[in-house]
Amino acid sequence: MKKTIRLSLLATAVIVLASGFALHASLTASAASAHSARGAAGSPADSMLHATFTDSAVKGTHGQGLVELILTGTGTVQGFGAATDVVGVVEDFAASPCGPGGASNSSQDRIAVHGGVLELSTTGMNCVTASGPQVTGTYRVDGQASTGIFAGARGAGHFTVSAATGQDTLSGTLILAEPGA
């Protein structure tokens, strides 16, 4: 039984890791480059985030039904250029909202570009489907923790990750604070 649980947790850690890679492999949200729209806060062009990352695990631990991972990577954010990200992920397999093999999922994402750091908080669930593990959930922009051009930003949206294919989608909003506000 102990061996089965360990193998299950190891398999889950691999799924979580793949989910983390996928979530940050292609970060896409609806609406235009926030950097170019900085002077026009509130315009439709001020509500899009598009970024791509390739992440790798720095550290992973498991115990008590929890898997914790730290992921880092590099990529680009449209309108900002080169970027790095650091992601702390926690999956709780004792709280499976979608049945056996599933888990609740949360992460804190830090995306750094020249000009600022964007902080995102996510919550979701990792579910086993016929096409492989799927992670779905929501994200929220943390404007108080964000810095530089992202300080005071707000926004929210949804994300979907297919750990099996490495494909993911994040869609929602990013509204920058007005300069001097």
Predicted regions span which residues?
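N-terminal secretory signal peptides that target proteins for export/translocation
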Residues: 1-5
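Sec-dependent N-terminal signal peptides
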Residues: 6-21
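Signal peptide processing junction and immediate N-terminal pro/mature segment
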Residues: 22-36
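Beta-strand-enriched cores of mature, soluble protein domains
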Residues: 32-181
